Amino acid sequence: MTNRSKQKGTSFESSVLPAIKEKQPLAERRALEGKQDKGDFYIPGEDRFVIEAKNHKEMDLSGWLREATTEAANANVPHGVVFHKKRGTTDPREQYATMKVGTFLDLVYPEE
């Protein structure tokens, strides 16, 4: 990954963080941990999912979901979600979130 790619990723993560903080004020970006990454954001008390953020011109949804799933396992949580850049807008709430249908159902309808 080039420095330019890292800069784009960091910029995207930083742009999305305020939207997350609206709901979870103590959320923060995580430091990179190599193969032991646990998602791109730390959200205190969140034990259901991690978020992997992507800002690429070409989409690789299956690859990104695989990475998010691996990082969820590293964080000992059941689900990985991908936030990815929507071209043509910088509004953090207009970016995309991708997950498996099972993840969506588990998050929307959690077991009691």
Name the predicted role of every residue range.
Residues 1-112:
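Catalytic phosphate/metal-binding cores of nucleic-acid and nucleotide-processing enzymes, i.e., regions
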